[in-house]
A protein has these predicted regions:
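Eukaryotic scaffold repeat domains enriched in small/polar residues
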Residues: 7-245
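Positively charged n-region of N-terminal signal peptides that target proteins for export
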Residues: 1-7
């Protein structure tokens, strides 16, 4: 059933492109964009193979997030195979999500109830409806303005909606320095009270400890390899000096 639904949505997108080659952009984004040729749009949609998911997958570390005016939280999750984006309500209840192919980093950006997904390596942004329909595909131009937008929006760890602030963070003490993603989503109200609505801190802490052990072990090996010949040479020279005495 899901395969038929996915095939139908892709077919609708291709049909709209063929029948309406010139249409107004459906995407409202902070990026400066250009139209992509129809063939490239169709190829991109087929390659990413985006699917709607209706049950919550396992929770992983957060690599990107955004919050819309209805306080729906889009969470991009860390994964090694297909990428996952899950949509949660403000109390942390799963609503729906998407999985898709992506060989690099990605970011999320709300456009009212639709979600924009930015594919960093491809320099492409797509608009996806809540039911998984791809509404538009645009090229993100290589510009100073877009680079600035990525740094200030997609790399930001806070979003403020009204009097409520949404924060992604780690709570692993000294091991925060090795984390490449975040383990918690916290909601802070106007009084400063915090409520954790998404938490994978325990799993992330174990990963951070293993990473720290690996980094320290590697550093020790490198230092040993570099300085061992120097120390050996110093000892040899000292022995020669003692012999001459």
């Amino acid at each position: 059933m899901k395969i038929k639904r996915k095939t139908l949505l892709v077919s609708i997108f291709i049909f709209v492109l063929v029948c309406n080659p010139i249409v107004a952009n459906a995407i409202n984004t902070g990026f400066l964009t250009n139209e992509l040729p129809e063939e490239e749009q169709i190829s991109f949609v087929q390659n990413i193979d985006l699917c709607l998911i209706e049950s919550e997958p396992s929770k992983n570390a957060v690599v990107c997030f955004d919050v819309n005016e209805n306080q729906m939280i889009a969470v991009g999750k860390k994964s090694s195979d297909r990428k996952t984006i899950c949509i949660y309500s403000s109390d942390g209840t799963f609503q729906y999500g998407y999985t898709f192919n992506c060989s690099g980093d990605f970011g999320v950006e709300w456009d009212k109830d639709n979600l924009n997904i930015y594919f960093v390596r491809s320099d492409v942004v797509i608009s996806v409806s809540p039911d998984g329909e791809i509404l538009d595909v645009l090229e993100v131009t290589n510009s100073i303005e877009n680079n600035s937008y990525v740094n200030h929006f997609f790399h930001a760890t806070e979003r403020t909606i009204g009097d409520t602030t949404y924060i992604i963070r780690n709570d692993m003490g000294i091991f925060n320095w090795v984390a490449t993603s975040c383990s918690q989503i916290v909601i802070k109200d106007v009084s400063g009270a915090e409520n954790v609505v998404y938490d994978v801190n325990s799993a992330q802490l174990l990963s951070a400890i293993l990473s720290a052990i690996f980094i320290l072990t590697f550093a020790i090996i490198v230092v040993t390899v570099i300085f061992r010949p120097v120390i050996k040479s110093m000892r040899t020279n000292k022995n020669k000096y003692d012999f001459c005495k």
